[in-house]
Amino acid sequence: MQPTEDLPRGTPLSSTGHPLPRRTSPEQSVTLRHHQLARDASLKASLGSAPPNDSNENSSSPRRASSGESHETGQSDAKKWFNQSNQNPTATFDSNAMDVDPPFFQKESDSSNEDKPYQFPPATIRIQSNARSSSADDYRSVIDDLTVEIQKLKEELKRYKQRGPDMLRKDKLFEIKIHGLPKRKKRELEATLREFTATLEGSPNTSSSKRNSTTKPSRHATRDRMYSGSGSKSQSKHASSSSGSHTRPVDSAYASMSTGAGSSGTSLNRPQGGSRFKTNEQKVDHYLREIPEGLYPRFVSMTEKEKKKLVVRRLEQIFTGKIGGKHVRRTQPTLTPAVSIALPAVQATSIDFSPQQQQQQQQQQQQQPKSNFITNPGATFSSVPEPLREARILPQEHQYGHVAGQKGRSHDIGSASNSNEDQTESGGNGNSSSNGNDSGTNPSPPMPPPPEQRPTRPRDLDPDRIQIPSENMEYIRHLGLVPPELLTNPPERTSFDFHPDEEGWVYLNLLCNMAQLHIMSVTPDFVRNAVVDLSAKFQLSPDGRKIRWRGGTDGTKFSSESSGDLSQRSPETDDTENTKGDNHKRQKTGHSTGDSGSSGNNLPKFGGPQVSASSESFHYKPLFLHQQSPNEQSSMEDGTLSSFGPIEESNADSRWGQSGSGASNRRKRRRDGAIIYYSGAPFCTDLSGDPGDTSPATYMLSSERERPDAQGQFARPLPFRSGSGSSITRRPLSDAHLNLGSIPKLQLLNEGVSIPELVTDSGDESSKLSMEFPWSDEPQILEVRPLEPCGLGGVRPEDHFMVVVTTRRSKLDARVGQRLEGQRKLSEEMTDIVVNRLATMSTSSPRPSVRRLSNMSDSSKIKIEYLSGRIKRLEPVSLPPPAIFFPPFSADSCSEDDFGSDGDDEFNSSEEFMSRRANPHQSDDYPDGVDLSSGDEDGEEPEDDIDASRMVDDMSLPGLGRVPRGSQASTEVVPGSSRGRSNSASAEAVLRAGGSSAATAGGVESDFSISSSQG
């Protein structure tokens, strides 16, 4: 480097002569000089403060003394710290001093002892400050996460919130959104909420401010009364815990919850009073003694098949009341009729028992006195009934305003079953479900309304409890969506015979919850697979959301249950149900749906007449769900309909995934709007609307009646899928390696079209061909796929026909040797191609001609022989409802085929042009994929083998002949070519009259056109 005296003269240069960058030497650097001065000052300050650190070693830490006697003050002063830092800036370079000397240092002390010096040891101070800072950081992270989550929720609420009219916004009470609720239930809910809001203050003119000012004190008073039992205790507890403590104050909510079992029970429940509520002296040991074994965790190793069997048994137990299997607890829990403790006098006054029934009731009460006390230790034998566990299900008379006091009371008693301790049927202690039916023949004085609901006990949730099918059916019927008055010509039936869905469909999610399948940790897809694979009593809907019981009193019998250790019902269950059946036979005086023995009369009605499921189920996951309704709406819009039309029975067991139903639900969810109610207003604003324009009664027909014909035209057939998931019926490129016999035969969905069996002509030529080349003569059933009218092309609804072609094709599975030979030829051809390309690249010569794979294609193509063909006229299709009307552009407008009339004189003559003007519905070209001519390229005319007696409309297709063995199977006809017109001149008029008709090669599939008129 150059010496320093040369630097001011100009730019410094390096040893090589290049100018150095714009920077000064280290000796003249201002930054380095300041750093050196600061380092020297910090060293002097540390050496000068060392003696005070040694003298005050016990009072403060050495690191705190470096900031200048800040340890002498009891609490740091921000102003003093700021002045001291400015006066002694060199001390700030000490990292140790900056770590422990923040501007605000607050001691952990109360206001009463602020003047006392801070005398904690240094180590203790460091530990406490670190702990405090770490806990604060933890809470800060939680608070930040919650803040971000709240912001996201607010944004989402703004996105989904729908504002009503601005003038009514100040009087807005609340808004609701309805998802999947049927129309009738939605109307009932809207009417109830309208009446509630209109009569909230008794006058529509009442302002919202008055209502809020009058209702708020009453709400606060009610809340104060509810929490008055534990208010004083919680306050005293909170005061004692917070006084004199140096920890964080305890939140009042946690303080009220931590006051013990007694106070927590009274603070969260309703106010005490009367003998109907339990006392707070119930011990924990009694509660633990009530927990059944089924609620304890079971570590049982099961295979997937065994778990599927258990799932099926749980679901079938709801309808049969029986369960078996090696993984089920063999000893069923002892039936503890807890209702009999509190209702002996009630039952004696409301029901007239025979002497035998009274004797059995007394024997049962004597056999289980201890278990009753364990189940309900606070209960006493009195005439006051115990609160019911379940919500009361009022009879139909009460729901429509009729007075039926005794029937409602007896039915309320019967609705308290479905729990393990409330099973009064099995022990013979009166048929609870038949009480509602026997009330007409056993008159008794009306009873007062039952008390409030009691809390759910652990025994009520026992998964191994014996299910009562009648009570389960009554619970499902109560969730029914179709009243009898909405049905056309409703049959004469009682309220107990009415089904929630006339076809018996119940939501699978409901049955999974009733069977408590969540304990087994199974997914809904696993439950669907288990039902489809193993159950013989359930039928799954095509969308997989609903399930139907086929009827009967016995569940599915598995092959493993034939052994002695696995039975369908346990011995104790057998004895119980036999006793139950005998008691019901004695107690029946009218209609009864009491036990599983008599439930056979009702279960077939619930399920309806069932048709056996199709043996061929779809093992694919569809990309799109083809809806059956004309407006493409989800089936959950009407809760009673899962699917209708002929697709329901043929594809009942199809295992559909969640993509189809999920897409329909998402499509419907976007249309869901809010229903806004206003204060004192007799109306509401409904932004959701009514999806669909079809009456609900249309879909609520039972399976016994005939369905309307209007639904048939909207029922779309499900697409056919091959083994690999393709929707193409015949795959000419890959069927050579497959077995054609594995393709399932398609059913003819359109029953109005009768297609005769397709047979071959018996001739000498065909017999000669069969000697050296095998042919397949098996008749096949064609699939008729209806095409919706689109209104394009100028065709009319009468142009609805189908081309039926009889073909004969070879059996490709017998040509394994030729396939291997073709592969060898293919390898030779590829070798020649590579050699030719290499020769072209090396010599730069013109590319030689490459041999085509004509020999290969001739030896491996599919041989199809057309034997006969005919035109089948179909019924005209109905036009879709017009969306918008387009008037004609001009009066003398013709079809779009006229635009190409004067374009090429070689292919369009004046006669053809005039014929098209005479018939404007003709088309210049053939539809795509149509092959009605099979002549070879030498111009050979095909033979005419069409039988005139088999023609429907006296129209022939002479172009359908035989294909020679050496020619290509499907000769493509170029649209508008002379060869295409010459070979099929007689069929031209037929094809042009119908728009698009197709006869696929092989006769596997035949498409037809459904056309509509313009506009």
Swiss-Prot record:
Circadian clock component involved in the generation of biological rhythms, in particular in rhythm stability, period length, and temperature compensation. Behaves as a negative element in circadian transcriptional loop. GO terms for cellular component: cytoplasm; nucleus. A motif (Nuclear localization signal) lies at residues 584-588. This is Frequency clock protein. InterPro entries: FRQ. Residues 69-80, 107-117, 454-465 have a biased composition (Basic and acidic residues). The keyword Phosphoprotein does not apply. It is found in: Nucleus. It comes from Trichoderma spinulosum. Residues 82-95, 369-383, 556-570, 629-643 have a biased composition (Polar residues). Its main location: nucleus. The keyword Transcription regulation applies. Pfam families: FRQ. Belongs to the FRQ family. Residues 443-453 have a biased composition (Pro residues). Residues 895-909, 934-946 have a biased composition (Acidic residues). One of its GO terms (biological process) is circadian rhythm. The gene is FRQ. Residues 1-138, 183-285, 352-383, 402-465, 544-614, 629-668, 706-728, 895-1015 are annotated as: Disordered. Keywords: Biological rhythms, Nucleus, Transcription, Transcription regulation. Residues 49-68, 203-216, 228-267, 356-368, 431-442, 590-600, 976-1003 have a biased composition (Low complexity).
